């Protein structure tokens, strides 16, 4: 329910390949830039997660459980670790009741090579992106 950007070109390419295998077509990676000073200017509602944490997990789980079209938060931009396939397995294990929340957090603590992403959740935020 927004526009996602990775800060890792290799992760973006790997994801494009994955989606092209799933859906057909050719993997394409588009590059964008934006003025990161906007994140601290007070102009945007910005939320930042620097690492996997209880707060990050609660935020991701709440969004995964959301069945409505509208976002459950009012943030223009959210930055934080990507819930990739390995993390997704743990999220699924927790949501299906196979592990408790503390075990879920412990498993996240052992994740290596965290990749981060930006979520642009409002038109105001998306309008700040410039394709390069």
What are these regions, as identified by a protein language model?
Residues 1-19:
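Extended catalytic/binding region for NAD+/ADP-ribose chemistry, centered on the ART fold
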Residues 13-14, 18-132:
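Conserved NAD+-utilizing ADP-ribose enzyme module
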């Amino acid at each position: 329910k927004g526009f996602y950007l990775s800060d890792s070109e290799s992760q973006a390419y790997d994801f494009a390949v994955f989606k092209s295998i799933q859906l057909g077509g050719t993997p394409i990676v588009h590059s964008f830039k934006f003025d990161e000073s906007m994140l601290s200017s007070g102009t945007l509602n910005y939320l930042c997660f620097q690492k996997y944490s209880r707060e990050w997990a609660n935020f991701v789980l709440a969004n995964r459980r959301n069945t409505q079209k509208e976002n459950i938060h009012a943030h223009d931009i959210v930055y934080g670790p990507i819930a990739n396939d390995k993390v997704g397995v743990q999220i699924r294990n927790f949501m299906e009741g196979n592990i408790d929340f503390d075990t879920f957090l412990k498993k996240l603590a052992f994740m290596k090579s965290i990749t981060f992403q930006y979520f642009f959740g409002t038109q105001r935020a998306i309008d700040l992106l410039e394709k390069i």
